[in-house]
């Protein structure tokens, strides 16, 4: 009972047309054989043509699949000689890493700082860092910096420049997908630089407008440097406003008692420089040939922190004339009148020479005038070459020779 006879078939008791599906729409071409009978199966069997299997292959029929290499994106965004140069750089770098011994001392980046950067990650903060990890991180950072610099240098070379600029780095970042994480940083820096440059330009225009209203011209700056907005006067205007010039501004000379106001000084002593921020300099004409101008009072520029000190402690021991600037040793007899030169034999050796800065005239009167040659080189007095006979014939010498020294023992003799 469990056996099934061989004569049993699924077609037994079923009509002949069971395997045919007729479309209810009446289209005779839409009949499909489902394949219950032998006739339906034989209809779908078609003869296989005789084709060489080596000529037709399913790999050749489909498009070739390119296997991506880890170095395919090295030359991304570059063509021609630039791509070839970058490919050669990477090949040389790989050969160096594979064959040369990598020493820790040859690294250009500090390992301690790299460890701190690695510790900022939340996954590594509470874990130990191996000794090789900072080394590999530093080596990869060096290669990354070198490649980015090389791409920026190729862009600067096209523009015939020898220095890298911010635009070169931005161009190198925009050409490769590997540097997408730097786009936000570069764009932020560019926005900050543009804002600062526009603000400096606005301040310069405002200062120029204010200077035009006040009759002042802005100080010219060098190319590439922002104008700080300090207007400088022209050569025909005073460096201070009228309100400041009305105040008593003192000008110290060699002695603080000889103070002069700023209005008394000639305006030609100030000059405006074309380039550079220099202080107004004092134009002192060299009139060394004119003897009358040697001992005239010249204003001396004193530093602000020394003005109060000089006012409280005046240097009264210095001579206010031209000899205050010339410290040379000369005989005192050269600065004396002619009749005092005859007393040179009675003077001691320590009193013969005295610095001219401290050598004041013993008798009131104007100091002796010197010509240009005598100011530079001390000239001997002609009185030194007079003979004793000539001195005896001098009436001045006879006048002093008859006088006795009050401290001498012979001065107490009765007349």
Curated annotation (Swiss-Prot):
Principal cellular location given in the protein's record: nucleus
Compositional bias segments (type: Polar residues): 369-415
Keywords, comma-separated and alphabetical: Activator, DNA-binding, Nucleus, Transcription, Transcription regulation
GO cellular component terms attached to this protein's record: CCAAT-binding factor complex; chromatin; cytoplasm; nucleus
Record's subcellular location: Nucleus
Gene Ontology process terms (BP): positive regulation of transcription by RNA polymerase II; regulation of aerobic respiration; regulation of transcription by RNA polymerase II
Gene3D superfamilies: Histone, subunit A (1.10.20.10)
Keyword set includes Transport: no
Positions of region (Disordered): 354-415
Keyword DNA-binding: yes
Family from the record: Belongs to the NFYC/HAP5 subunit family.
Assembly notes: Two complexes bind CCAAT; complex I, that consists of php2/3/5 and complex II, that consists of php2/3/5/4.
Protein name (record): Transcriptional activator hap5
Lineage: Eukaryota, Fungi, Dikarya, Ascomycota, Taphrinomycotina
Gene: hap5
